[in-house]
Amino acid sequence: MRIQLLRHYFALTLLLITSISSASPFGLSTVAAVVSANTASTASPKTFVFSAIPDQDEANLQERFDKVAVYLQDQLGIEVRYIPVKSYAAAVTAFRNNQVQLAWFGGLSGVQARRLVPGSQAIAQGTEDPFFTSYIIAHSSTGIEPSDSLPAAITGKTFTFGSKGSTSGRLMPEHFIRENLGDTPNNLFSKVGYSGDHSRTIALVQSGAYEVGAVNYKVWDKQLADGKIDSDKVKVIWRTPSYPDYQWTVRGDVNNSWGPDFQARLTEALLSMDDPDLLASFPRSGFIAADNKLYQPILDTAISVGIIDADQ
């Protein structure tokens, strides 16, 4: 269809040049120059768009990732824009529909997105992401103390995960709960909720709305350092074993739109990011190379928990 449209366009262009050049006082060269300029305009690279899973407050993410967009624009020499999404599922959908070409995904959402878009690649991850962990946190009223093993005393309590699509706020905590306590969350807890993001999980447990919850350790540590957590009301009672988590994933067709070396240049720009203010957007100390096979354990776990269908 696109080829046919181009043929019609150039046929009409030739007819226009032929008819106008004989009558126009500006002559053939002027008309040709106008056509050339219009053709160049239509061939200009489109805006490169990226997003990120909404694992924290949306307003903060917008402010921080807008700065990342400026950085990438300077590095790549094209227009770059960040767009927020309302949920983890919305981030995956935007990637699938090519509304965004790059996304800062969690381990699970990245696996889901790459399964939907063949050829897409994990290209960079945070320095901390190969060894990511989750915290199990509890309200002080439970009387549960920190332990090196998952406290069985959480059984029967109300429990909130983060987003249903979160690696650190749902998938891996659920996996370790099943592994350590021998049953599903719905059977173990008196009530199971999904807060939507890590910041809300902390707020819900701190307020006592839920007695226990699972949270991304980076979000907890940052909020604690920022003075947003009341340690008299909520505390970490267990830290999970490590697992691979967040990564930058890019669609496999970006080179078709921005040039044969675009993915390589994009990867280099991400790996070279060293401005502490930009890195605080994630928050990470830096980025290292990543690839799809690093996230096979996440896929395997998602299949075993029942979040991903192995036959899809």
Give a label for each model feature.
Residues 26-28, 33, 158-179, 264-312:
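Ligand-binding clefts/hinges and TM-proximal coupling segments of bilobed small-molecule sensing domains
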Residues 82-93, 106-108, 184-203, 244:
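Short helix-initiation/N-cap motifs at beta->coil->alpha
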Residues 49, 53-54, 128-135, 228-270, ...:
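Periplasmic-binding protein-like
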Residues 126-182:
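A conserved helix-loop-strand patch within extracytoplasmic ligand-binding domains
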Residues 66-77, 168-194, 222-230, 304-308:
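Ligand-binding cleft/hinge of the Venus flytrap
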Residues 104-117, 178-179, 204-207, 211-231:
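A ligand-binding cleft/hinge motif common to bilobed small-molecule-binding domains
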Residues 36-65, 287:
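Extracytoplasmic "Venus flytrap"
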Residues 9-22:
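Bacterial N-terminal signal peptides
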